[in-house]
Amino acid sequence: YSGYTNGYYAADGAFLGYENNGTKVKFMLAGVVGLVDADEVEILNYEDEDTVQSVNYYICKNGNIYHSITLNIRQPYYTSTAMVGKQQSYMKSNTVYYSYDGHYFYTTYQKMIDDYKANTRKNSINASKPYYNYYQYVSSRTKTSFTASDLNGYVKSYLDDLYNSKDTKMYNMGKYFIDYQNTYGAYALASFGVAVNESAFGTSSIALSKNNLFGHNAVDSDPGLANGYSSPQNSILDHDKYYVNLWYSTPKYSTYHGAFLGDKASGMNVSYASDPYWGESAAHWMWQLDEYVSGKSDAGSKKLVFKDQGAINIRKEATTSSASLYTTPKNGNMSFNILGKVKGESVSGSTDWYKIQ
C-alpha cells in the first residue's frame, strides 16, 4: 500500500539500502518499511558524531518506557518525549534502546540495522516477545472505565488557571466523549487522547477559532482549511460518528488499516496524519490520564491478538466454509481485541479460533 509522512515530524529513519538502480531509498520508520525518492532524503553515517548528534531512542525510568524524538539530527537535543507504556521485564532502567518499529529493542544501533537488513529481529533484547503499546493498539470499539469527571479533572489539572470556557475548548467536554463513545462505538479515551494531542488541550488556534479539537482537514499544505464547527462538542460528534466509527474502523473504506491508533504500518495513523508518531503521541496522553486518576486504568483490560503481513478472512463461524464478513488489508501488526476463544475447524493443526472485536 502507499502511505505518506512529513519529514518535519521525524528527522531520522533506518537506511536499508538503494533500489530501482539507486533512484529509491529503502527505509524503516514508525513500523513500516518503504521506498522514497533518493533525492528527497539525505543518507548520513550514524557513527559520524560531528554530523549525527541525535537519533530516536527509548529509555526506561521510574517503571515507564519513554520514546525521545528528534526533529533535527544535527542538533544534540530532543523535541519531545512520549510515554509508550510500562517497563518490561527484559528492559533495564536508564539504558538506551534503539528501535524504528517500537516492538523490538536493541542495545546498539548497528545491531538494529543489521537485523533490519537481514529481515530478522534475532539480535534484539526481546526477539521472541515483541512489545506493543497497549493504548496504541487497543480497538477503537473498546469502552473506557474512566468517567466524564475523570477526563474533565485531568484537563483542569493540566491547564490550571486556563481551565475556563474562554481559554480552552476542552472545558467540560468529558460528557461528550463518553456519550458519543456509547452511541457510536468510538473509544472515548482514544478520542480524548487525540483531542488533547491535536488541540493542545483545546488551546490551539484552530481549536479556539474553529471549535475543531482534532485538526480535521488541517492539511500540512494549508492548516487554515481546517473544518469549522458550531461548538467543540460537535467536533467530537463528527470525529466519533464519522472519522472513527465509519472511515477508520469500517473495512469497506480505503482509510481502514485497522481499528486502533497505530503507527505508519497499521491503524488510523496510516491515513489520518502525516506525523508518523501521531498514534503514539495520542496514546501518551492516555497513559498520562492513567497516572493522574489513582486506582483506575484501562491498560490491559482487553487481551489483544495481532495479524502478520498478508490479508486474512474474518469469518462469521469457526470454519473456513463460513461466510467471510470481510478480508483484512495486508498491513502487518494489525490488532484486534479478543472477546473469547472457541473450538472449530482444524486449521494448520489447531482447532482454536478467536472471537474478535
Regions found by a protein language model. Give the residues of each.
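Solvent-exposed beta-strand motifs enriched in subsets of small alpha/beta binding domains
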Residues: 27, 356-357
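Catalytic cores of secreted/periplasmic lytic hydrolases that degrade extracellular macromolecules
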Residues: 1-190, 201-322, 328-332, 346-350
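Pyridoxal 5′-phosphate
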Residues: 198
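Acidic glycine-/aspartate-rich tracts in secreted/extracellular proteins
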Residues: 341-343
